[in-house]
Amino acid sequence: MRPTLGRTRETLFNWLRPYIHGCTCLDLFAGSGALGLEAASLGAAQVTLVDSNREIIEALSANVGLLKAENCQVVHSQAEHFLRSAQSPYDVIFLDPPYKQPKLLESALESLYRGGLIGGHIYLEAEHEKLLHDLCERFRLSITRTTSAGTTHSVLAEP
């Protein structure tokens, strides 16, 4: 797991602040849940946190309970399986797959695109900036913001 750095997270939410309140969010590779929980604290109407690791899900569920984050749903599922059953687009999507697993990013984008689930802003994080730009071009996403911290590159894009 590669948690999103605090500085990167702060930059991201400065970008997203005008759009978060009342929106639906998907944190597909939730890990620590930092991105989804931050969105929930900023007034997102619904945040879905998805991860395939049972221990992570148990910790996320406990944190959601402690925070009394009633606008959060924690889902134990593989990303692909979850996306096959998703019904409607998300206003904000966070795609921050585990470190050194770029294929997960590509397959998640493929499923999101094919399912018509990208309803607004999408945050992508990876080790290689070129990969992010190539994926955005392939899936017809316009990059609105970029940032880098160390070896981690991030973009905010929209359809």
Feature names for model-found ranges:
Residues 1-159:
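Class I S-adenosyl-L-methionine-dependent methyltransferase catalytic core
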